[in-house]
Every structure is written in C-alpha cells, then in structure tokens.
Amino acid sequence: MVRNKAKGFPNQNNNKFEGEPRAKDDYASKRADGSINSHPQERMRASGRR
C-alpha cells in the first residue's frame, strides 16, 4: 500500500486553498450580529443551487 506522502504530492507544507471560501454569508445559519437567519429550508435549497 502506498501512502500519499510517498507519491510526492505538491504543496505538502502550505495547505491553504486558493480562491474564496465556499460558505457565503447569505447561506449562513446565523447573521454577524448573532441573530438567527430564518427560513432554513429555503436557505439550504439556495445554497445547493449556486
């Protein structure tokens, strides 16, 4: 069995991903002020369709 370290994958030490994070504020369950975002089914559906 060959482990990932033996295959010589690049970027071993710096595991930061490029680009924006996938989680957007529009689809978060809580707002920045701590209040709960309503309509969770609509929020989850919209998050999956983006």
From Swiss-Prot:
Q: Where does the UniProt annotation locate this protein? A: Spore core
Comp. bias (Basic and acidic residues): 17-33, 40-50
**Keywords of this entry:** Sporulation
> Sorted alphabetically, which Pfam families does this protein's record hold?
SspK
In which broad location class does this protein mainly occur, judging by the first location in its UniProt entry?
other
GO terms (BP aspect): asexual sporulation; sporulation resulting in formation of a cellular spore
Electron transport among the record's keywords? no
Q: What induces it?
A: Expressed only in the forespore compartment of sporulating cells.
The annotated region (Disordered) lies at: 1-50
Keyword Transport listed: no
Q: Which InterPro entries match?
A: SASP_SspK
Name the GO cellular-component terms: endospore-forming forespore
Report the sequence similarity comment from the record: Belongs to the SspK family.
User: What name appears for this protein in its UniProt entry?
Assistant: Small, acid-soluble spore protein K
Protein species of origin: Bacillus velezensis (strain DSM 23117 / BGSC 10A6 / LMG 26770 / FZB42)
The record lists the lineage as: Bacteria, Bacillati, Bacillota, Bacilli, Bacillales
